[in-house]
């Protein structure tokens, strides 16, 4: 046996040292001290960041919500059924991110951005933090482009602009979700990506919404995020932030997005539940002191960006449920003060057959007027006042039987205008058709039509226009203003239709 030379031995040792890799993974690890109701108290993670994602040895994940001197309060995603005292937890040193971009469009996701529609994984390399700073004043531009909902009462009286936050508020079962879904359906062909965030809804309700969006071809440009009533409070709390992160991607890439939060009352309740378990002091209505801040930091991320930033926009339609019409409760008043206006839906109107049940007296759009097209402004300029006077007159007629001719005429026209503003669900109307029917009502073309037949008159008018005078609709659509020639033509068309219309 030949002996190894000294030089060979040293070269072999040298080679071994060069190729030696120390496979060592450094991790900060803590232990679960207690776990209850989706919140874990952890000892031993001193360097953890606020809202950092933590990993449990059971495979569960959570975020650090409470940073105390000797422990960390962690909100666990899901129910964490296998977590118990003594379970190891390690840091990931990253904040929570969700997938963004065109890869998520057309999908149904949970609050963590994971697909729940059975269509396979989301293939994307683009992720965004769920907590981002809202754009500053200098990065914004005033709202000036319309975002049409296709609902006559909204587009005429409480117009919404791209980059606006418009609250939809009302009692249970007054058609709040329907208004939001109509707005999403109406964005077809408008290059607007829509995000619907369901918070604490029944699974069956969300399935119905997805079915409706698919039926009207709206899922092609929509994302649905679902944190249902059966999900944990943590998932319900995180869902809107995941949704807005996805919307911000389009806003920041010079595109337009619309986000619906359905609804923020349940979001506040989920946050209240988490805060109680984290032993944070309760305030008014037992909500924690920072409940205003969780909604303001969410809604401030909706904005119209300036030209230097690409002029993209993110429009928000938060929904809030009231109890017995009480808009002075804590959460409704908070969100009213954060948003740029509200659409108020009333139970009494809903049950009296006025649908959408929008109370035009209490509904307001603080910045949308600048975004409304001129043609709509021209036909609906006095509509709010006319409807207010009609309501006053209607209340007066309950006590007085004798009315002069002018009052009778005003009352009759008011009744017809109320009928004009009625609309079936899931049937948004293009703005040019809205202009035509509101013009017909405001200028007295419906005065000779019986109140019960106004809806029928409208249903027959639109096909007549499309068949015989499509150029009128086309001109309103392109010009966006009723000039003298166009108005004269519109009058002629309406007079001709009245001759052919039979009740």
Swiss-Prot record:
Reaction(s) catalysed (UniProt annotation): ATP + H2O + 4 H(+)(in) = ADP + phosphate + 5 H(+)(out)
EC code: 7.1.2.2
SUPFAM superfamilies, A to Z: C-terminal domain of alpha and beta subunits of F1 ATP synthase, N-terminal domain of alpha and beta subunits of F1 ATP synthase, P-loop containing nucleoside triphosphate hydrolases
UniProt keyword Hydrolase present: no
One term under GO cellular component: plasma membrane
UniProtKB keywords: ATP synthesis, ATP-binding, Cell inner membrane, Cell membrane, CF(1), Hydrogen ion transport, Ion transport, Membrane, Nucleotide-binding, Translocase, Transport
Species whose genome carries this gene: Helicobacter pylori (strain J99 / ATCC 700824) (Campylobacter pylori J99)
Biological role: Produces ATP from ADP in the presence of a proton gradient across the membrane. The alpha chain is a regulatory subunit.
Membrane topology: Peripheral membrane protein
Subunit structure: F-type ATPases have 2 components, CF(1) - the catalytic core - and CF(0) - the membrane proton channel. CF(1) has five subunits: alpha(3), beta(3), gamma(1), delta(1), epsilon(1). CF(0) has three main subunits: a(1), b(2) and c(9-12). The alpha and beta chains form an alternating ring which encloses part of the gamma chain. CF(1) is attached to CF(0) by a central stalk formed by the gamma and epsilon chains, while a peripheral stalk is formed by the delta and b chains.
Intracellular or extracellular location(s): Cell inner membrane
Record site feature (Required for activity), residues: 363
Highest taxon of source: Bacteria
Entry-linked Gene3D superfamilies: 2.40.30.20, ATP synthase alpha/beta chain, C-terminal domain (1.20.150.20), P-loop containing nucleotide triphosphate hydrolases (3.40.50.300)
Gene Ontology terms, MF aspect: ADP binding; ATP binding; proton-transporting ATP synthase activity, rotational mechanism
UniProt xrefs under InterPro entries: ATP_synth_asu-like_sf, ATP_synth_asu_C, ATP_synth_asu_C_sf, ATP_synth_F1_a_nt-bd_dom, ATP_synth_F1_asu, ATPase_a/bsu_AS, ATPase_F1/V1/A1_a/bsu_N, ATPase_F1/V1/A1_a/bsu_N_sf
Family: Belongs to the ATPase alpha/beta chains family.
Official protein name in the record: ATP synthase subunit alpha
Residues reported in the UniProt entry to bind ATP: 170-177
């Amino acid at each position: 046996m030949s002996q190894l030379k000294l030089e060979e031995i040293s070269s072999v040792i040298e080679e071994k040292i060069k190729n030696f890799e120390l496979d060592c993974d450094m991790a900060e690890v803590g232990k679960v001290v207690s776990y209850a109701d989706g919140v874990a108290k952890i000892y031993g993670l001193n360097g953890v960041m606020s809202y950092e994602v933590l990993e449990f040895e059971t495979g569960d994940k959570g975020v650090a919500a409470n940073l105390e001197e000797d422990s960390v309060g962690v909100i666990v995603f899901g129910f964490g059924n296998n977590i118990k005292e003594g379970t190891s937890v390690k840091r990931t040193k990253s904040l929570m991110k969700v997938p963004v971009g065109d890869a998520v469009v057309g999908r149904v996701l949970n609050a963590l951005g994971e697909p729940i529609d059975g269509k396979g994984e989301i293939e994307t390399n683009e992720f965004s933090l769920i907590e981002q700073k809202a754009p500053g004043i200098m990065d914004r531009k005033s709202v000036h482009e319309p975002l049409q909902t296709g609902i006559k009462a909204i587009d005429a009286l409480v117009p919404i602009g791209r980059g606006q936050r418009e609250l939809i508020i009302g009692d249970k079962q007054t058609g709040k979700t329907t208004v939001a879904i109509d707005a999403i359906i109406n964005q077809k062909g408008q290059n607007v990506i829509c995000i619907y965030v369901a918070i604490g809804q029944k699974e069956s309700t969300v399935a119905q919404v997805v079915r409706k969006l698919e039926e009207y071809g709206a899922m092609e440009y929509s994302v649905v995020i679902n944190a249902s009533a059966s999900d944990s409070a943590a998932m319900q709390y995180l869902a809107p932030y995941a949704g807005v992160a996805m919307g911000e991607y389009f806003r920041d890439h010079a595109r337009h997005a619309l986000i619906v939060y359905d609804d923020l009352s349940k979001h506040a309740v989920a946050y209240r539940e988490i805060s109680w378990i984290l032993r944070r002091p309760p305030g008014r209505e037992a909500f924690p002191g920072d409940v205003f801040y969780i909604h303001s930091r969410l809604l401030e991320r909706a904005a119209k960006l300036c030209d230097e930033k690409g002029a993209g926009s993110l429009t928000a339609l938060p929904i809030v449920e009231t109890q017995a019409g009480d808009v002075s409760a804590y959460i409704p008043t908070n969100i009213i003060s954060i948003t740029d206006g509200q659409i108020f839906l009333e139970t009494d109107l809903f049950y009296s057959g006025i649908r959408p049940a929008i109370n035009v007296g209490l509904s307001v759009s603080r910045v949308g007027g600048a975004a409304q097209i001129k043609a709509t402004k021209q036909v609906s300029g006095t509509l709010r006042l006319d409807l207010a006077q009609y309501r006053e007159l209607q209340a007066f007629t309950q006590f007085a039987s004798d009315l002069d001719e002018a009052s009778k005429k005003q009352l009759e026209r008011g009744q017809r205008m109320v009928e004009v503003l009625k609309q079936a669900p899931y049937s948004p109307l293009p703005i040019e058709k809205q202009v035509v029917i509101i013009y017909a009502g405001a200028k007295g073309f419906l005065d000779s039509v019986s109140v019960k037949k106004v809806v029928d008159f409208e249903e027959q008018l639109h096909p007549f226009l499309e068949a015989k005078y499509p150029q009128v609709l086309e001109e309103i659509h392109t010009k966006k203003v009723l000039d003298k020639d166009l108005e004269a033509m519109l009058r002629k068309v309406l007079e001709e239709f009245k001759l052919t219309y039979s009740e």
